[in-house]
């Protein structure tokens, strides 16, 4: 585990919205650590360092927490971000151990260019897989290079990293290659609202 993922976590003794606001004002993120039948632990972690790790690894980041001198490895399970100011409001962390399998949602990234005259519609941006807790892929790539109109890629056709197992429905549609709209289609789409407005005014 890289030292860049280390965070010093402070056990919280105050709770409620007021305490959470004070923690954030002091540059901390309120978190809850749970799992393995242990009682949930309420912690604060440094906001700047936590945000840096999430930017580098995504929302499934693995953390090494220093909790009062004891090291604990954890998976970032969920992150709540303020919708306007974009700071991290809260996070849930899951206790993990070496060799353990976890079920997580991983981002699906489309790469390559489909055939000329086509448009790629991505129906699923994430996919649920089971993976080693310490070897979670940052993303799963799906190539559309040269694909023709009518081609579909299902979850069962994704190339998963070694040791990972698909948990989503095998028939989940990931990518659908369709005909790109023509200029006539675009013009017709632009004219329709104008025609509707004219009809309403008549």
Curated annotation (Swiss-Prot):
The keyword Membrane does not apply. It comes from the Bacteria. InterPro entries: Rbsml_bL25/Gln-tRNA_synth_N, Ribosomal_bL25/Gln-tRNA_synth, Ribosomal_bL25_b-dom, Ribosomal_bL25_C, Ribosomal_bL25_long, Ribosomal_L25_dom, Ribosomal_uL5_bac-type. GO terms for biological process: translation. GO terms for cellular component: cytosolic large ribosomal subunit. GO terms for molecular function: 5S rRNA binding; structural constituent of ribosome. Keywords: Ribonucleoprotein, Ribosomal protein, RNA-binding, rRNA-binding. This is one of the proteins that binds to the 5S RNA in the ribosome where it forms part of the central protuberance. Part of the 50S ribosomal subunit; part of the 5S rRNA/L5/L18/L25 subcomplex. Contacts the 5S rRNA. Binds to the 5S rRNA independently of L5 and L18. Belongs to the bacterial ribosomal protein bL25 family. CTC subfamily. This is Large ribosomal subunit protein bL25. It comes from Rhodococcus erythropolis (strain PR4 / NBRC 100887).
């Amino acid at each position: 585990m890289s030292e860049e993922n280390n965070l010093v976590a402070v056990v919280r003794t105050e709770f409620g919205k007021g305490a959470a606001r004070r923690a954030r004002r002091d540059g901390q993120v309120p978190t809850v650590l749970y799992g393995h039948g242990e009682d949930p632990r309420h912690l604060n972690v440094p906001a700047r360092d936590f945000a840096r790790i999430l930017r580098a690894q995504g929302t499934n980041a693995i953390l090494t927490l220093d909790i009062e001198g004891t090291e604990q490895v954890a998976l970032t399970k969920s992150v709540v971000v303020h919708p306007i100011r974009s700071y991290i409001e809260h996070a849930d962390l899951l206790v993990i151990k070496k060799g353990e399998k976890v079920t997580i949602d991983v981002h699906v990234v489309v790469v390559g260019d489909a055939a000329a005259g086509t448009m790629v519609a991505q129906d699923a941006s994430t996919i649920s897989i089971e993976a080693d807790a310490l070897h979670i892929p940052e993303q799963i790539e799906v190539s559309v290079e040269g694909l023709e109109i009518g081609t579909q890629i299902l979850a069962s056709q994704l190339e998963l990293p070694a040791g990972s197992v698909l948990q989503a429905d095998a028939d989940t549609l990931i990518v659908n290659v369709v005909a790109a709209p023509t200029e006539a289609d675009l013009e017709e789409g632009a004219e329709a609202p104008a025609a509707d407005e004219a009809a309403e005014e008549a």
